[in-house]
A protein has these predicted regions:
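Interdomain/boundary linker segments immediately adjacent to catalytic/signaling cores
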Residues: 1-40
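Catalytic core segments in nucleotide and nucleic-acid processing enzymes
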Residues: 44-177
């Protein structure tokens, strides 16, 4: 077949575009969550680069907040020896379709199992589907210590945001802004 587009090629273009769109949705969710964390710890920021915040906490220790591959956002304290104390592993599931939420929670569980093995103190999952049954999600991802809805984190008056803020500040040792 001399055509530029062979039938098999056409069959793979749709899934490739969808996969690319899903990556964009996931990246957007991570960026939003990172921005919320940044807002919470802004008084402790001493340096900032793309996807990374260097903080100084109340004990005068460096704390790193980074966008990473796995977990999506990691928060670590640098000990005086230079060793990293793994504080918080955050998985962000930015997809909005309810039909796939159980798969996303399963993906978060796999990531959190790795994070637990790496010594993270807390493992959190942020979901972007408001209809998510968080009790069911806890059964599906027992390694997740806390679940948050992205919509709650965007609502600074919500109980979910206040809990997220309090825990970030307590675990990092960064004063409230």
């Amino acid at each position: 077949m001399p055509s530029i587009c062979r039938p098999r090629t056409l069959l793979t273009i749709g899934p490739q575009w969808r996969g690319s769109a899903n990556v964009d949705i996931g990246t957007e969710g991570i960026d939003i969550a990172f921005g919320i964390v940044r807002e919470i710890v802004k008084l402790g920021i001493v340096a900032e680069a793309s996807g990374r915040l260097d903080l100084k906490n109340a004990a005068n220790r460096p704390v790193l907040v980074e966008i990473a591959a796995d977990p999506d956002i990691k928060i670590q304290e640098v000990m005086t020896s230079g060793a990293l104390r793994q504080l918080i592993a955050i998985e962000v599931k930015g997809g909005r379709d309810f039909s796939n939420i159980h798969n996303r929670i399963g993906e978060a569980e796999k990531s959190h199992q790795k994070a637990c093995a790496a010594g993270y103190t807390e493992c959190w999952t942020i979901v972007n589907v408001d209809r998510t049954d968080l009790h069911q999600a806890r059964r599906e991802s027992p390694s997740t210590d806390r679940f948050y809805r992205l919509s709650d984190l965007l609502d600074r008056a919500s109980e979910g945001y206040r809990d997220f803020q309090d825990r970030i500040q307590a675990l990092t040792g960064i004063a409230a802004s």
